[in-house]
């Protein structure tokens, strides 16, 4: 065994050993329990970042732990390869997105392999490959035929200069990110998934997910947003019907969760696209201008929440069905046409948004809810104004004094008797629009025929292949300019037809990839029935909390869709979910001439610390001049505070990177980058290597201790007690608790006790062998390369076949224990006694201690309290 720890030599050797033995290549094996461990697959952006390293190390630790425990473990990997960044990079570098993507995949795959992850690379998939997205297209056509996928107009951000649709994040202050042109809202035909058909099941099945973080389940519940409320129809006033047709000329319909406040409505607000707004604006230029302004605004709900609320009165009126009040109709920029009825009733006295709007435009506020003796002030919003639970109705005629539920029932009865409303359950969740007017995505398998309409591409003509030799120019959809792509024959009538040139939302690919891993080369469907039956659901899923809503919700939705197609036999995709925290690092900057910030990489900064180790000042190494310390933030390119994993691996080795990531913080918490922490992790690995080296130098490996320990010295028994209690703790930390930092700390404590124990005797060397073999097995999930190498020196066999160490219960039974001695409740000494010492023996031993004799001062004991195994308290 070489004396020095050299990761650059041992890590490639260990990886070659695993690859040659193909130990991570897995197939269905009914003789073993299965364990499917999956970390969210990466977008091939070019390089791994530290967040990737943390995510995949967590998955690898769990996979290797389960492997040693006899499970048939699948840990696959692939690439979430479609998406806008590839198009942006392609335009910047004048290269096809496909070429850019495949180059990145090759480099990142090399990085993943250098970290020693126990990945079954035979299952590798890239979502941009036709053999993958073929089956996504197939499912789309099946769901289109069932009506779960449908086409309707949707609102998008249109850049009139680049002649293209922009994502919400590409609109900056109302202008296109490339052209700078003012963005318009446009209605275009788009495809939607009826996720709302599954809203109730998606909501209810959250209760089945016992091993998901409550925070994630709460976020999904709120996103689905089930509410019980009432549809209310306000009759359109006779003098306000001009230009309206059908039901729109008869009534304005709204949905409210607070019908108890209906008597307090003082106006109603409609979206700019509402027919009532259009009719009112017909002869009013100021309304037309406001409607145009609204249509130019963002279509993102998040932006709606933070933007300034604006409105204009239409001069049209509707009638409150409860009290006959005439309410003016306003056009407001905070009302969305695509959400609900595109209209809301406004109760300024009891809704904070309405209160602010009414204050801004001097509209009336009518109190109809009272809470205790609180006084209503129309000039100042107070939290109790919106209190549904504790309020009672006032200023509401014969409804006065009623609580929410009583008023709800009474108002429902009144409205239903008039045909003016009824109770309704509604969801915040909206159908999922999956059409994207971009190139680098999965083509939508629909053909548009003038004779036959929208025709799904037949299965035997799939996949509709995306041409890969295209370099986008940012001016509209490349596919819409390629007759060789869109010109085709109708599958029904054979006549000339046109392919759909939109592509699918990239959330589509990540909504089912975990099933494709089960049989990635299966050519007769999305997943083979045998593989789906064996692997079932993912046992452990790992990824960031930022995916709590959309990705995880869509994956749950797709699982139910595939179940209903008879493709899988599970209701939920992920049995257990771990959301790891971010990797964060200090940030530094200097202000530039334009008033902006030039961010400086931490490696280029020199710090000065106070006597408590806190940074007090920082200078740039290059010029010695000050930089601003800006606090700790998530590692990112924008803040220039990232650390390249490859540099870390080159300097210290993959095991050091893995150990630091697992030891620096519990997995669900943020991990703060620390150079000293990395050095500390490397020091521990050098110590582990040195410990085994010194042991072997003293006489080579021996047979590890096993069997009856009665003949061992107390010191060796204590070491074995520590060893087997460590096995129990680490097993629990890896398995149930998933707290890897405390598992590492436990092994460190074990090695500390080993260093203090004399193991020079023949029995001592056998116990030392047991301790070192076990420590290596316990650490293999986290630092597999060094452990693989040390195991071969200690044991000569294959560590991956060694199994997880078992707890020797006999070693946990102590023959002697330490008991505290107190006099009048104060600690005065300790005694070592037999573990089975009687009460009388404990009392006698305690009374004989030097501390007891001294502090009893010759007085007799009034009482002696014995807590078995812990203490003896002498009361004088």
From Swiss-Prot:
Instruction: Report whether Nucleotidyltransferase shows up as a keyword of the record.
Output: no
Q: Which superkingdom? A: Bacteria
Give the EC class as a word.
ligase
Q: What is its EC number?
A: 6.1.1.4
Could you tell me which InterPro entries the record lists for this protein? aa-tRNA-synth_I_CS, aa-tRNA-synth_Ia, Leu-tRNA-ligase, Leu_tRNA-synth_edit, M/V/L/I-tRNA-synth_anticd-bd, Methionyl/Leucyl_tRNA_Synth, Rossmann-like_a/b/a_fold, tRNAsynth_Ia_anticodon-bd
Localization per Swiss-Prot or TrEMBL = Cytoplasm
Q: What is the first-listed, main subcellular location in coarse terms?
A: cytoplasm
Residues annotated as binding ATP are: 637
Can you name a GO cellular component term? cytosol
For this protein, what reaction is catalysed?
A: tRNA(Leu) + L-leucine + ATP = L-leucyl-tRNA(Leu) + AMP + diphosphate
A Gene Ontology biological process in which this protein takes part is:
leucyl-tRNA aminoacylation
Tell me the protein family, please.
Belongs to the class-I aminoacyl-tRNA synthetase family.
Recorded protein name is Leucine--tRNA ligase
Q: Which organism is it from?
A: Neisseria meningitidis serogroup C (strain 053442)
């Amino acid at each position: 065994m070489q004396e020095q720890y050299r990761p650059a030599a041992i890590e490639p050797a260990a990886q070659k050993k695993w690859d040659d033995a193909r130990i991570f290549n897995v197939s269905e094996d009914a003789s073993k329990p299965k364990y499917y461990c999956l970390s969210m697959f990466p977008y091939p952006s070019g390089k791994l970042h530290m967040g990737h390293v943390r995510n995949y190390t967590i998955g690898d630790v769990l996979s290797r732990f389960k492997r040693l425990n006899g499970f048939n473990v699948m840990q696959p990997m692939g690439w979430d390869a479609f998406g806008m960044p590839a198009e942006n990079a392609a335009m910047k570098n004048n290269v096809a997105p496909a070429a850019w993507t495949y180059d990145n995949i090759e480099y990142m795959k090399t990085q993943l392999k250098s970290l020693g992850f126990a990945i079954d690379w035979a299952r590798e998939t890239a979502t941009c490959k036709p053999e993958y997205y073929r089956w996504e297209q197939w499912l789309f056509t099946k769901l289109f035929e069932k009506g779960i996928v449908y086409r309707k107009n949707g609102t998008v951000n249109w850049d009139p200069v680049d002649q293209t649709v922009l994502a919400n994040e590409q609109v900056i202050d109302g202008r296109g990110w490339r052209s700078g042109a003012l963005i318009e809202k446009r209605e275009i035909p788009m495809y939607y998934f009826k996720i709302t058909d599954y809203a109730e099941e998606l909501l209810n099945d959250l209760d089945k997910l016992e091993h998901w973080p409550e925070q994630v389940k709460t976020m999904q519940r709120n996103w689905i947003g089930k509410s019980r409320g009432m549809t209310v129809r306000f009759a359109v006033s006779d003098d306000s019907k001009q230009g309206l047709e059908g039901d729109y000329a008869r009534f304005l319909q709204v949905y409210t969760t607070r019908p108890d406040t209906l008597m307090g409505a003082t106006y109603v607000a409609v979206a700019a696209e509402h027919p009532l707004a259009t009719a009112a604006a017909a002869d009013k230029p100021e309304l037309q201008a406001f409607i145009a302004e609204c249509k130019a605004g963002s279509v993102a709900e998040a932006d709606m929440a933070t933007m300034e609320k604006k409105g204009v009165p239409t001069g049209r009126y509707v009638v409150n069905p409860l009290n006959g009040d005439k309410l003016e109709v306003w056009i407001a920029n905070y009302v969305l046409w695509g959400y609900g009825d595109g209209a809301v009733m406004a109760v300024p006295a009891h809704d904070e948004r309405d209160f602010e709007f009414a204050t801004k435009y001097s509209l009336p506020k009518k109190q109809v809810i009272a809470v205790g003796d609180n006084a209503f002030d129309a000039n100042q919003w107070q939290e109790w104004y919106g209190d549904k639970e504790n309020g009672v109705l006032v200023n509401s005629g014969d409804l006065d004094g009623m609580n929410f539920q009583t008023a709800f029932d009474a108002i429902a009865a009144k409205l239903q008797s008039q045909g003016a409303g009824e109770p309704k359950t509604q969801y915040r969740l909206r159908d999922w629009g999956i059409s994207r007017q971009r190139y680098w995505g999965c083509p939508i398998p629909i053909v548009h025929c003038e004779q036959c309409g929208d025709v799904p591409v037949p299965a035997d003509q799939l996949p509709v292949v995306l041409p890969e030799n295209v370099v986008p120019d940012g001016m509209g959809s490349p596919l819409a300019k390629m007759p060789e792509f869109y010109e085709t024959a109708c599958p029904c009538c054979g006549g000339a037809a046109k392919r759909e040139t939109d592509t699918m939302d990239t959330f589509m690919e990540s909504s089912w990839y975990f099933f494709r891993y089960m049989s990635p080369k299966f050519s007769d469907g999305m997943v083979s029935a045998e593989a789906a039956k064996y692997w079932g659901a993912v046992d452990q899923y790992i990824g960031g909390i930022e995916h709590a809503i959309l990705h995880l919700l869509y994956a749950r939705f797709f699982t139910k869709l595939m179940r209903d197609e008879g493709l899988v036999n599970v209701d939920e995709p992920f049995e257990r979910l771990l959301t790891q925290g971010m990797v964060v690092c200090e940030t530094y900057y200097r202000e530039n001439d334009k008033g902006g910030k030039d961010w400086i990489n931490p490696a280029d900064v020199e710090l000065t610390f106070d006597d408590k180790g806190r940074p007090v000042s920082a200078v740039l190494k290059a010029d010695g001049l000050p930089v601003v310390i800006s606090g700790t933030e998530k590692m990112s390119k924008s803040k220039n505070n990232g650390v390249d994993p490859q540099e870390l691996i080159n300097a210290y080795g993959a095991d050091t990177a893995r150990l630091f990531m697992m030891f620096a913080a519990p997995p669900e918490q943020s991990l703060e980058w620390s150079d000293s922490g990395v050095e500390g992790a490397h020091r521990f690995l050098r110590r582990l290597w040195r410990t085994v080296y010194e042991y072997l130098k003293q006489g080579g490996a021996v047979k590890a201790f096993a069997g009856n320990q009665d003949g061992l010295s107390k010191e060796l028994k204590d070491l074995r007690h520590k060893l087997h209690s460590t096995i129990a703790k680490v097993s629990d930390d890896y398995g149930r608790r998933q707290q890897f930092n405390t598992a590492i700390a436990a092994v460190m404590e074990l090695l500390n006790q080993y260093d203090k124990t004399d193991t020079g005797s023949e029995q001592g060397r056998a116990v030392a062998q047991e301790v070192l073999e076990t420590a290596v097995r316990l650490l293999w999930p986290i630092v597999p390369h060094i452990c693989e190498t040390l195991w071969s020196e200690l044991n000569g066999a294959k560590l991956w076949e060694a199994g997880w160490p078992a707890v020797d219960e006999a070693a946990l039974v102590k023959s002697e224990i330490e008991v505290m001695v107190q006099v009048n409740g104060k600690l005065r000494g300790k005694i070592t006694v037999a573990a089975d010492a009687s009460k009388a023996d404990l009392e006698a031993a305690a009374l004989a201690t030097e501390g007891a004799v001294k502090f009893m001062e010759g007085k007799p004991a009034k009482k002696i309290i014995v807590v078995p195994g812990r203490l003896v308290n002498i009361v004088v």
